[in-house]
Structures are given as C-alpha cells and as structure tokens.
Amino acid sequence: MTHLPARLAIRPRGPIDAVVAVPGSKSITNRALLAAALAPGESVLEGCLESDDTAAMRGCLLALGASVAQDADCWTVRGTGGRLRVPAAPLDARASGTTARFVAAAATLAPGPVVIDGAPRMRERPIADLVRALEGLGARAQILGRDGCPPVRVLGGGLAGGEATIDARRSSQFVSAVLLAAPYARRPVTLRLEDGALVSRPYVDLTLQVMRAFGADCGWHGAGALHAGAPHPYTSVRYRIEPDASAAAYPFAAAAITGGRVRVPGFAADSIQADLALLGVLEKMGCRVERSAGAIEVTGPAPGRALRAIDVDMNAMPDAVLALAVVALFADGPTTIRNVANLRIKETDRLAALECELRRLGARAEAGSDWLRIEPGPLRGAPVETYDDHRMAMAFALAGLRIPGVVIVDPGCAAKTWPGYFDALASW
C-alpha cells in the first residue's frame, strides 16, 4: 500500500476499462475468524481480508486464547474449543462494530469477566439491545459506557441458552453476535425478533451460512425467530472467503459514473452477500450487468446517455448506500434512498455526512430520519471530509473520476476495510 498524504487529489478520467481484484469480505472474514477461534483444532481460512477491522477481531481473539498464523491471505487459526481465557486487559475493538458486538457475545463463554472497549466512536455505537438479549439467555453483563454504548463488562461463566427476544431494528449485528456464540450454550437457543423486525437481514443469512460451514445446526424458525442447536460445538474446517461485495460496490459504481466497464472476479454464482443487490439498482439506472465464470461485469451507460434517477429501499444493503449516493450525482433527476435509519449509527452519522458532502460538490441533498434525497446540480470540485469513515473516502473518490478538483481529506481511513483502495483506483 502506497503511503497516502493527508489530502489526496483525484484525477478525472474517461470511461474506465478494468479487471479489479477486490479483497476478501470483511463480513465473512470476521465471522469465520470467530467460528474458527471457538472450534477445536486448526481451521484454515483462505482469502482473508487484512484490514483494521479484521486486525481488531484477530487481536481480541488472540487475547481470548486463540492463535492465528498468517501466510498472505491464508490464515491458520488454532481454536479454543469454546474454552476461552480471561484476558489480562480490556479488549480493544478499535472502530469495528462487528468485533465489539461479536466478541461481547463470545465473551460470555469465558470463565471470568471480560471488558470490551474501542475507539471514541465505538463508545457512541449502541450495544444495549445485544446485552439485553444475552441476559435473556442467562448471561451476565454490565454496560460501562453512556447511553447503552461500550465499554461493556461481560461477567462470563457461560451461556445458559433457552429463549430470548431481541430488538434488531437498529443493527443486525446484535442477532449475528448471539447466533455465533449460541452453539456453546448449555441448551438450544431460540432468538425471537421483537415485532418481527430485522434490519439488513442478508447479513444474518450470511452469519447462518458461515456457522453451517463450521458444522452448526442453525437457521430460521418461522418468519420471526432463529434457532441454534446447543451444545453443538463448531468443527475445524478449511474455508474459502469470497471477495467483499461491499468493496466491489466502488468499482461497479465507477463503471456507472464513467460509462466504462469493470469486471470483478471471484464471486460464487450463489453468493448471498447483501451488497450484490446494488447490481439490480445499477441495472435500473441504465447499466448492463453480466455474470459469467465466477465474475461480475458492469458496463455504464454509453457516452451521451445519462444514468436514470431512482427511488429505492436500501434497508437490505446499507453499506452500498454511499456508493449509490455518489452515482446519483450523475443521474438525470432526483434520486431518493429510503429505509436506512441505521446509517446514523455507523462509523459516523452517514446520512448527515452524505448530505453535507454532496452539497459541497454542488448537489441539492436533503437527509431525513431514514432517507436521503439527491438532486444533481451544477457540480464542482471541493475538498471532501471523510469523518474517519472508510466508506465516505472510497465513495467520494469516485466523484473525482468525473468532477475536476475533488480532494479526499484523510484518505488513509480506507484502511479500515480496503488498505490498497487508492492504489487500485489509480490503476483503473
């Protein structure tokens, strides 16, 4: 990865034509790391993502007694068999929501207290709904932070299991966290969704897929509940991690913006990653999408043809919102993105950040409690603030492919999920 300056000017260019190697999925890497750390014996994970978020998960799991040997993107994890140790110091989840929440649930299996903390923004991201669900399954935990946010002290001693209700309207990570630890409960776990509501369901389906790959007995129990057999420990496996669909959103969006063509190899034909749903949105806006031989190719509209504006519910693919918001700058009318309230509790308040930075580039943008409306205007270059949010940096860099004078402030924050992003962008 090239050392990045504090402010990086993006060079406009014509239609791109590129084959882009997208790094491994962060979501899958962190789920597989945790399952492998809980399993007995050695698991081999191929295609892992090395990033700030996965380093945070790895560091926490090492402190809990697992070991990880890295050989490029192939990691060998020696698991604990569910017998976690009590770390000597609080665990640092950094700015990783998946790490803080998944590890908080797993820490119930330790024999003594475990404190999970993180970066300042992590202390503003909710965890109370997860803690309440864990308590409903017999765990003991104390929230040490303000307003239901970390740090959290999990007292350990195991997870009894049984039945609990969880409020998953703000984050699906709460559900995934409970599920990932559930095979080590003393009896089977049933998790009921409060009011049947679940944001970003595809991420829970992804969790179930990873758990089954490690031998868990888990799944949906009707439309509003999930179950996991227990005690039913994971088994050690060799597991292949596919490319990150959330990361692939940026080269796909680049093809749309420049009227070019991008091919991303490595996706399974039956991939269930949430952000691949962006492909259908881009098709409706006038792009052509083709799948063949394990690759996905997106071609933007021909020169002289504008992208079509769209009104779209993105609840199931929230991480793709930022890329689409920048694509909307080049549409033929106003685009509205709906049902994305949980963007306000991500690495930053993404709805507020998008509204501000889209306006900075000349768009007429307005954000509501769970929606964003983008009306293209006379576009102009400007420095773009990134709010220490990797997706803000990666998305707004795409605007610079068409708009002269776009400068990304703190581009290094992209290392959270794609450390080599700006090197890749320069090569497209």
Predicted regions and their residues:
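Short, structured segments at the rim of ligand-binding sites
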Residues: M1-W428
